[in-house]
C-alpha cells in the first residue's frame, strides 16, 4: 500500500488526471495516498493548513468515483485533492488571510478562481499557508506559524505562496494556486524547485485589473505542462 501511495503522489498532475479518467486509480485511492503523505510530512513543513476531516474527504472521493461509474466526468481535476492559498475564499473553509483579525472567519462562498477549480472536479482538502495578508517573501503568520522549504524545512519556503510551493515540492499537492504582487508566485517556485508562474494582470477572470494593477493570481506546478493546464483552468 505504501508503494502504491508514493507512486500516485509522484505522478504529474496530468498523469494523475489520466489515471483517474481511465479508472486505473480510483479517487478514493488517490485521496488516501495524498492524505497519507500529508500526515507523514506536513508536520515538518507546515505547507497545508486548515486540513479538512479525513472521513469527509474520503466520502467526497467516493462520490467522485460514483459519478465516474455513471459516466459523469467533471473535468481534468475530477477527484483530485486541492488546497487553495489562504488568501482566497473556499466555501465552508477557514479564510484567515494569516491574520488574527480573521482567525475565526469561514468563507460563505467560493471565489471566482476557486469556483473554476471546483468545476474542473477538484476536492478541496484545506488551505496553503501564507504570511499575514500575503505581505512577505516568507510564509509565517501568527495563526499557523512558518512554512519550511521542501528541500530543508528549517529554511523558509519563500512567499507569499510558500505553502503552495512547499506542498508541491514535497508532493503533497498535484498542482497549486497562488498570487503575486512582487514575486509571491515566483520566489516560492524557486525556493521549492517548482514552477510559479505570474500571468499578466488581465489574464485572470473574475477580477478588475484596474483596481489592483500589480497583483494577480496564478498557477503553480511541478512541471511546465501541469502549470499550463492549470492556468487554463483558472484563467
Enumerate the predicted regions with their spans.
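An N-terminal boundary/leader segment
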Residues: 1-60, 70
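Enzymes and membrane/adaptor proteins characterized by extended Gly/Ser/Thr/Asp/Glu-rich
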Residues: 10, 41, 76-113, 140, ...
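Short, well-ordered beta-strand elements within core beta-sheets of diverse protein domains
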Residues: 15-22, 101-105, 215-222
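Structural signal for hydrophobic packing residues in well-ordered secondary-structure cores
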Residues: 24, 35-45, 61-69, 118-121, ...
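Conserved hydrophobic/aromatic pocket- or pore-lining residues that grip, position, or stack substrates
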Residues: 34, 57, 79, 85, ...
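Immediate post-signal peptide segment of exported/extracytoplasmic ligand-binding proteins
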Residues: 64-81, 226
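Short glycine/serine-rich loop segments
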Residues: 109-234
